Design a protein with these regions (language model features):
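Polytopic transmembrane helical bundles with strong interfacial aromatic enrichment
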Residues: 1-140, 148-168, 195-228
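Membrane-interface interhelical connector segments
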Residues: 137, 141-145, 175-189
């Protein structure tokens, strides 16, 4: 997201630097969590594939290094190196998502849907983060253009809708591999946590992002930032 929006709009150097440093902080936390909590061999009775587990933290470490270099290029205004570094970070980040998807793809009916689900979920997180951060930047300087916020909000809304469609399709499909116990055979749609995932995780964010988009179009950056 940092690569896409920085290429499309004239974003301030301070904003780009803050965004890259924030992502680096999140990556460091993710690396620590993965190292301290290895992925189990099964989740809720369904087997996981942990053969490529060690490559996930390695890819995150590589991504952290590339983003650190990008932050240095932004700070020193080395414009010629910013785009290649951002592109490399996007490729390594996508690789990390694909590795994570491969770990949980065994019980999934379609590995493609699982990978798309993770990709769109990551795009939602990235779009919302960039928009929220730009909203805070706008509050410190009202002269900034509203177009980046409108595009970021619209992008997040579209990804949320596509993410929801994939979740609905995936929930209707059976597991491709049998679970280890009969408890895991319970109907998914009878579980409260499933509907919490749909309501709190999808329907509410779509409504909030739709309101944020309309607020951004009329210049209500404070409302947009709060909703996101």
């Amino acid at each position: 997201m940092l690569n896409i929006f920085s290429y499309k709009y004239e974003l301030t150097r301070g904003y780009l630097l803050t965004a890259s440093l924030s992502i680096i902080s999140a990556l460091l936390i993710s690396i620590i969590i993965i190292l301290l909590n290895p992925i189990p061999s099964s989740i809720d009775g369904f087997q996981t594939d942990v053969t490529d587990e060690t490559f996930i933290p390695i890819s995150l470490v590589a991504l952290t290094g590339i983003l650190s270099a990008l932050s240095l290029f932004i700070r020193r205004q080395t414009i010629s190196l910013q785009t290649p570094a951002a592109t490399a970070a996007s490729i390594v980040g996508l690789l990390a998502i694909l590795l994570l998807g491969a770990t949980f793809s065994e019980p999934a009916w379609s590995a493609i849907l699982l990978h798309l689900n993770l990709i769109f979920g990551s795009l939602v997180l990235g779009g919302a983060f960039m928009a929220m951060l730009w909203g805070h930047w706008y509050l410190t300087s009202g002269s900034l253009p509203k177009e980046p916020m409108v595009s970021m909000s619209l992008f997040t809304l579209v990804c949320l809708i596509l993410h929801s469609i994939i979740v609905i399709i995936s929930s209707l499909l059976p597991a491709s591999s049998p679970p280890e116990n009969e408890i895991s055979l319970a109907v998914l749609h009878m579980e409260l946590t499933f509907w919490l995932r749909i309501g709190v995780g999808l329907i509410f964010p779509i409504a909030a992002t739709w309101l944020a988009l309309h607020a951004a179009r009329i210049g209500g950056m404070m409302s947009t930032t709060g909703l996101l």
